[in-house]
Amino acid sequence: MSQPIIVWFRQDLRLDDNMAVAACVEANAPMIALFIDDRQHERQAGAVSLWWRDQSLQALADELQRRGSQLILREGDAASQLNQLIDETNPQAVFWNRQYYAESIARDTAIKADLQARQINVESFNSTLLFEPWQIRSKTANTPFKVFTPFWKACQTHGIDTRIWDAPMQFLAPSKWPQSLALTKTNLPEGAHALDQWQPGEAGARKTLHRFLSENIHGYADGRDFPAKPATSRLAPHLRWGEISPRRLFAETSAAPVSDNDQRKFFAEIGWREFSYQTLFHNPNLKTTCLQPKFEAFPWREGAEAEDDFEAWKNGTTGYPIVDAGMRELRQTGYMHNRVRMIAASFLIKHLLIDWRRGEAWFWERLADADPANNTASWQWVAGCGADAAPYFRIFNPIIQGQKFDPEGHYTKRYIPELTGLSGKMLFSPWLAKSDLLENANVQLGQSYPKPIVEHDFARNRALDIFKALA
């Protein structure tokens, strides 16, 4: 029997359309599937995302077992664990799919040099993105794009590969399996009790895609902004851990009976993910440093009052129902509707003047789909300090946003049942309701539901004055 190949899984917890797995199969070699919990060289995933990862690893292990293989689990420094496994199994090669953030790039570069010095063949592949983050560049300046629209146009002009590789139903096994740690399960943080709606793993990702293409994508271009409608793909957590490839999303959506408008909008959302990874690759300090340096001088609020406001925002007790509904959805489900993410992020940054990095860290901790590129790039976009960022004067009015995008109040009342008796404008600004209306709705401001922690017009003008001074 030929020597095995170690396939090191990381952010690619699937078998189909996995280029490292494909290369192993094409080499006709036994596969040793490896996952290393390396917390030293990667930004530690938040509690909810770790919960998802552990569920996904179990699904991957089960699928490998059905196909005559196993998942080998190790923990600790990746270089040390790889070298130890090499000593145990004498492989002909080590394959992996590339990651694109600074810590992983530095680690992988060092490991590749070390293994090559040991005469071990090392190959890496792109199985995470449609394009490598260095691939699409401005033709005029030969530099990375800083604006999304021309970037995505260049991607489409280049052409998107939609060929899908399907994994075999049976893998070659090594003559002897190495030892593996047992799978562990991360406990969910306090308050996260409604995650049974998800099915982590490759099979769950495929089901989610097929449900989206058969039902929710119709009317997606407009409906995706309304949080009460089932009009989003809900694929983000599956993409986060590589349970499905963006190439498959493109291929299957292209083949589905979908309107051009809905298809174009969905593809653009995949494009934003590509743009975020390009931005992160070329700006490795993205999670800590504003892309526009002038924003480093922004006078963020600090002190006891700001801390109280930050806690109110995290807990969904700001007194602005659409913001609070989103923050409670996040706490309970590990997810927040995209439109509401923008509203909640804008409120923290522009109403409360609290550093976007603190909001990014909270989303990182509580989102199942907390992605190293998307999460940071999105927060910088809302703050106005990132690539192709929202203009500083775009300050969402949370009252109007609620009325416009949750007109029946179904989403808001789902997460704030104490306001079930209110409707229309009063639902989104209960402090303006007359006392008899509040009494009939069984709402006691300051007791059953909080009063606003800041007045909108005051907060808006305060933020505009500061942003204008920086502009």
Label each PLM-derived region with a short phrase:
Residues 1-163, 262, 374, 457, ...:
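Trp/Phe/Arg-rich N-terminal binding region typifying the photolyase-homology
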Residues 20, 56, 60, 205-212, ...:
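Alpha-helical packing segments of well-folded alpha/beta enzyme cores
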Residues 48-55, 73-74, 95-100, 125, ...:
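Bulky hydrophobic/aromatic packing residues
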Residues 53, 202, 228, 316-319:
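Generic alpha-helical segment signature
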Residues 120, 141-296, 405-406, 410-471:
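Glycine/tryptophan-enriched, flexible segments
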Residues 230-424:
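Active-site-proximal binding-pocket segments
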